[in-house]
């Protein structure tokens, strides 16, 4: 079976893939940024629509193929992808980096999250999660999981993982063993391509998961218990100043604790934006 990767092929290769899939009745339209109206345009009135207000812009590492972003104390935890270039590190909002750790050059790094004194870091197709010391990011061990790894976030008692499907997995924070799954739906329809994640506990105690959507500028707000998408943030107004490349898309969302603001960035983006999610003015 032909599978589509976590990055976009050059046009010449995509043409070959399209011909191959066309001959067997396949469809790659779900991977295209021009595949049709955004989820925000198709959602019903039951799903809250929000936009983005940019509060501040900070310098960011334009070489980082960002796969994970999270606020940890006074720093940001960043995990990156691409074979031979995947790493995890801490950085300040002024782009002062520390504790950089590479992974096996044959592996493609994915999302990461800190839970307690431990950081977990995913790989894309190797089924390996790295367990790291939260202070130094030194490797403490590994754990195995089935399928692909895309995004990670955590609450105090559970790690949440996406794998590109319409499911979120709930994992043990100590062993990474799977506890359960929930199907994610948008107005009753399966919502897939869930990518980088951020876990936020709302003012009412509700557990929310914010998810980038692969190759989209939409961000889903998901009720972690029911799996229902309760809000869609249209982040298309956030400036993408990355080099021209179809892979350099929005990816990376991190709530700033004690505030109504988030950090957002993208793959190989030179900027980190501090934003609020707001109701549209019109």
Where would I find each of the regions flagged by the language model?
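Bacterial signal peptide processing site
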Residues: 24-28
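A short helix->beta-strand "capping" segment at the edge of beta-propeller domains
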Residues: 41-63, 92-96
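Beta-strand-rich domains and repeat architectures in extracellular enzymes and scaffolds
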Residues: 55-87, 101-113, 150, 266-270
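Surface loop/turn motifs at the tips and blade-to-blade linkers of beta-strand repeat domains
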Residues: 57-62, 101-105, 141-147, 182-192, ...
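Signature of short aromatic-glycine-proline-rich micro-motifs recurring in repeat-based ectodomains
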Residues: 66, 194-196, 245-254
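Conserved beta-strand positions in repeat-built beta-propeller and related beta-rich domains
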Residues: 76-82, 114, 119-126, 161-165, ...
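Short loop/turn segments that connect beta-strands within beta-propeller blades
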Residues: 91-96, 133-137, 172-176, 223-228, ...
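Blade-loop segments of beta-propeller domains
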Residues: 95-149
């Amino acid at each position: 079976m032909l599978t589509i990767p976590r990055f976009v092929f050059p046009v010449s290769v995509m043409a070959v893939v399209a011909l191959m899939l066309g001959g067997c009745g396949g469809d790659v339209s779900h991977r295209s940024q021009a595949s049709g109206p955004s989820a925000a345009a198709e959602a019903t009135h039951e799903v809250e629509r929000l936009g983005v207000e940019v509060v501040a812009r900070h310098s960011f590492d334009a070489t980082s193929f960002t796969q994970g972003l999270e606020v940890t104390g006074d720093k940001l935890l960043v995990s990156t992808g691409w074979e031979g270039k995947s790493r995890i590190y801490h950085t300040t909002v002024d782009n002062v980096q520390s504790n950089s750790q590479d992974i096996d050059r044959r592996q493609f790094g994915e999302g990461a999250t800190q839970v307690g004194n431990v950081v977990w870091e995913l790989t894309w197709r190797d089924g390996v999660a790295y367990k790291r010391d939260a202070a130094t990011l030194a490797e403490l061990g590994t754990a195995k999981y089935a399928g692909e790894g895309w995004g990670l976030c955590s609450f105090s008692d559970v790690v949440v993982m996406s794998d590109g499907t319409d499911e979120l997995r709930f994992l043990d924070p100590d062993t990474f063993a799977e506890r359960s799954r929930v199907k994610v739906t948008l107005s009753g329809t399966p919502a897939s391509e869930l990518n980088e994640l951020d876990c936020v506990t709302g003012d009412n105690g509700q557990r929310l998961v914010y998810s980038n959507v692969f190759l989209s500028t939409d961000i889903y707000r998901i009720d972690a218990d029911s799996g229902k998408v309760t809000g869609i943030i249209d982040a298309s107004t956030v400036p993408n100043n990355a080099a021209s490349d179809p892979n350099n898309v929005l990816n990376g969302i991190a709530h700033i604790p004690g505030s109504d603001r988030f950090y957002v960035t993208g793959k190989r983006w030179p900027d980190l934006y501090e934003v609020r999610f707001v109701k549209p003015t019109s």
